Structure formats: structure tokens, C-alpha cells
């Protein structure tokens, strides 16, 4: 027997029982996005490597350790990367196709991303993100509306009581530069207390030290200078405006001054929705403002704000805290059973007639042999509520036997009345 080939570690198959849950959650989220005026954008999963180096930052963990990068074939031999996130791709597409200059755009995307990480529950090497990006608006009101949108998601999924909003402002580029100097000076005074990861980041990306998961580092940081003390007036006013809007609509939040996010393009507002229901993988949705990224990637200066949510982690959370959120496991509403030498072609023709009249009906026809009991067993297995029975007698008479599998009642109807009868029985 030939050796079996398995999926790559950290890259998962999603089988029909899984995808039904995915589809139900995706449809819920997409409907809410449409209600806020968002349109879908689809970008390639492979981009030129410099896009992510310039957007995310050369000294971030994503660029240094986690990207899947390879050299393309051909004479050009360009460096390409499987996308680790899609904000950069959206910005690249917006600039390339002229969507952003002097325009307001509200875009959403859904698709696979790739990062080389240690696989664990809720963290995979291929994972899926649903994200939303808004271009052309710079006030705190759009930041607030994006957060309101996500809060509406949580209510629709039945998880609102299990997520907490954390907020921070990381200010302008100039404010962060001043704070960076103060933070590095503090870290230099305590370098003997830093772990190796923080020592590595101390000069290359010191704000990420604030994000350390090491409890001893977090204790040390209690005495560190605070970013809020270095905020410029505009950033402080923006953040105060955002908090006031969230207070007005009743969205509770916690200001977390150590929340900095792992990507270099953020400025001013950053936020995360976190949960304690998934162990160490606590962040389910995160985002913020990135007003300088469009210019940085070659476009005109354009304010922007957005977020992304990991679908795998969200699905784990929904399944953990809201068992009533169940996807429909039935694949058929109606099952067409047929008997007799000439019944197969007649059954296929009848099925197509029904689909023409009732295009949203889920109809399965029996294929292969099987007596009456066996075919009704297949109907039940597929979750059908109605069985249509077509034999030689029904074919000759131009009728169909309709059996309600819930009540057991069976009636004979003409083919011309069949669609109306099915509509009546299925509500």
C-alpha cells in the first residue's frame, strides 16, 4: 500500500461538519458588515516580500521569524511571501487601483493567512482572518463605529458576556520617538532583569517589551515611564473623544497602557477584544489606526483604521461559551426515491423540474439500488423532511407520492401541483 500523505503541520482540513459552522458564523458577520456599508475586497494570498517588510516593520516577529517567503521562478527571481496579514494587501490594492485618493472606502476581506508559529489550540500556520478597513476618515467617531460593529458581532454570536475590550493610544510617530528614548533609558538601568527576548527588543523595537508575556517583566514595567505622559495633544484629544463616544453608547472598556500591537504601522488608537475562555490564546479581535501606511506604501496621505479577527479562534470561543449556536446539519429538505427499470431517468427529470420551480430547495435524488426501506433510511440520514416516491405507477399516472417523514402522512399529488404542495409542507 502506498504511503499516505497528510496535511502539513499547523494547516488543517475543515470537513463538512466544520464548514457548516463556519458558514453560519461567516454569514452572520457578513450581514452585519453590509449593514455598516462595507464592501468585499479579494486580494492575492501571495505578495511581493517588500510589501510586508515596509508595512509591518523589518524588526517585528512577523517579518523576522514567521513569514513564509520564497524566491519565484524565472529570470526575475523575485522574493514572494504568503500573506501573514491582509491590511498591507488592502492598502497595496487600494493604491494600485486608485480607490483611496480623496475617497472614503469601507472594505472587508476573508481568507487564509500564513505564519510560521508553533501550532497549538487557536494558533495555526494557516489561519483565516476576517478583517475590515476604513480609508479616508480621521475622526474618533469612525474608530468608535468600528468597535460598535464588533460589539454587534459578539451579541449576534452570543458571546458578548465573554469578551472584554481593551483600549490604548500609542500617539503620533513623534510622541512615540520621545517615549521610546525614555523607555530605553529605563530598560538600560534594569538590563540584568530582562529576559533574552526583551534584551533583543530593547533597541530594535522597545515598545514590544511592554507586550511581554513574562510576569517578571510585567512587574518590572510597573515602574517604567508611561506612554500616556508622552502623548501629543491631538492624540490625547482623539483618544478622549473615542472614549466619550464608547461611554455614550454603553460599550465598556479597559484602558491598557501596555497594549501596543505587534505591527509597526499603527498610530493613535489600538484595541483588542480579549477573552479568558480560551486559555493563553486570549485575543479574538484586534486593530487600530494606521494613518501613515498609505503614504508609506507609495500613496497619497490617507487616514485609515481597521481590525482583523481570527476565524478559528472565534469559532472555538462560540463553541465553548454558546452551545446553542448550532449549524444546520441537514443537507436535504426533500429526498426523491425511485423504483423500477425506467424510474432513474424519470426521477432525474422530475428533480430538475422541481429545482426550476423551487431554486432554493435542497433536493437530493437517490442513486444506486435500494429497496423502499433503504431509500427512506438514506432520506433520514441526510435530514430530509419530505420523501418523494416515484415508481412505475406514478410515472404512468403523472403523479408523485409525497411522504412527510415527520408525521408519517403520505399523499398522492399530480406533478403540476407538486411544487405548491412542497412549499406548503415545508412552510
Swiss-Prot record:
Main location class: cytoplasm
Location of this chain's protein in the cell: Cytoplasm
Xref: InterPro entries: aa-tRNA-synth_II, aa-tRNA-synth_II/BPL/LPL, Anticodon-bd, Anticodon-bd_dom_sf, His-tRNA-ligase, HisRS-like_core, HisRS/HisZ, HisRS_anticodon
GO molecular function: ATP binding; histidine-tRNA ligase activity
The enzyme's E.C. designation: 6.1.1.21
PANTHER family per the UniProt record, alphabetical: HISTIDINE--TRNA LIGASE, MITOCHONDRIAL-RELATED, HISTIDYL-TRNA SYNTHETASE
Self-association state and partner proteins as the record states: Homodimer.
Protein name as annotated: Histidine--tRNA ligase
Species for this entry: Proteus mirabilis (strain HI4320)
